[in-house]
Design a protein with these regions (language model features):
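Conserved SAM-binding motif I beta-strand of class I
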Residues: 50-55
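S-adenosyl-L-methionine
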Residues: 1-25, 36-39, 43, 62-92
Length: 195
C-alpha cells in the first residue's frame, strides 16, 4: 500500500493558495508547463476572472490546452507562447496571485529550463504590479544547475524585501536528502510595494 504524502509540496502550495485564489480577479501562471497549476487556478475561481499562463515551449502550451479542454476550462485561461518576463505586454492590471513552478517541463528536454536572469528581471516588476494582499508562490527545484542558481538568488533577494511591505515564508522538507523542492510564499501587506 502506497503511503500518502500529506505535506507534499503540491498539496502545501494548494492549501496555502486556495483562500487567495477564491478572492483573486487577475492570476498569473508564470511557468505553465503541463498546465497543472493553470488547471488548479481555473478550477478554484469564478467565471469572471482573468488567468494568464506563460511558457516558452509550444509543447507545454499544447499539453496545457489539452488538459484544460479535458476539464472544460480552456475558456478561463489565456495561454501565451512567451516568457513571463514579458508579462506586462499582456497584463496591465494589478495582479492578485502569481505562481511559479521553476525548472523544466517534465518528460521534455531538460536543457530547456527557467533561468535565473529571467527571474532577476521579472520578479521585482511582478512584485510592483502585485495587488494589496496579493500573493506570489514560487516552487524552486534545486536538483539541477539552473535550479540551484535560481534558488541561490531567491534566498538572497527575498531576504531584502521590506518586511513592512511583504511577508515572505519558506517551506521545505528538510529531512529529505534528495534535493526536495523549496516553496517560497510572498504576500504584499501594503497597497504599494517599496522595492
Amino acid at each position: 500500500m502506497r503511503k500518502v504524502q500529506n505535506f507534499s509540496p503540491v498539496k502545501v502550495v494548494r492549501y496555502l493558495l486556495r483562500e487567495h485564489i477564491a478572492q483573486a480577479k487577475v492570476l498569473l501562471d508564470a511557468t505553465c508547463g503541463a498546465g497543472n497549476d493553470s488547471l488548479f487556478l481555473a478550477e478554484n475561481t469564478p467565471e469572471d476572472i482573468s488567468i494568464h499562463a506563460f511558457d516558452i515551449q509550444a509543447e507545454a502550451l499544447e499539453k496545457s490546452c489539452i488538459l484544460l479542454k479535458k476539464h472544460n476550462l480552456a475558456h478561463k485561461v489565456h495561454l501565451h507562447l512567451d516568457s513571463y518576463v514579458n508579462f506586462a505586454n499582456y497584463v496591465q492590471e494589478k495582479i492578485d496571485l502569481i505562481i511559479f513552478n521553476l525548472g523544466y517541463l517534465p518528460g521534455a528536454n531538460k536543457h530547456i529550463t527557467t533561468q535565473v536572469e529571467d527571474l532577476q528581471q521579472a520578479l521585482p516588476q511582478l512584485l510592483r504590479q502585485l495587488n494589496k494582499q496579493g500573493v506570489v508562490c514560487i516552487v524552486s527545484y534545486i536538483g539541477h544547475l539552473a535550479g540551484k542558481q535560481e534558488n541561490m538568488w531567491l534566498e538572497e533577494y527575498l531576504q531584502t524585501l521590506n518586511n513592512k511591505a511583504f511577508n515572505v515564508g519558506k517551506y521545505m522538507l528538510f529531512n529529505h536528502n534528495n534535493n526536495a523542492p523549496i516553496i517560497y510564499i510572498i504576500e504584499q501587506v501594503k497597497g504599494e510595494s517599496s522595492l
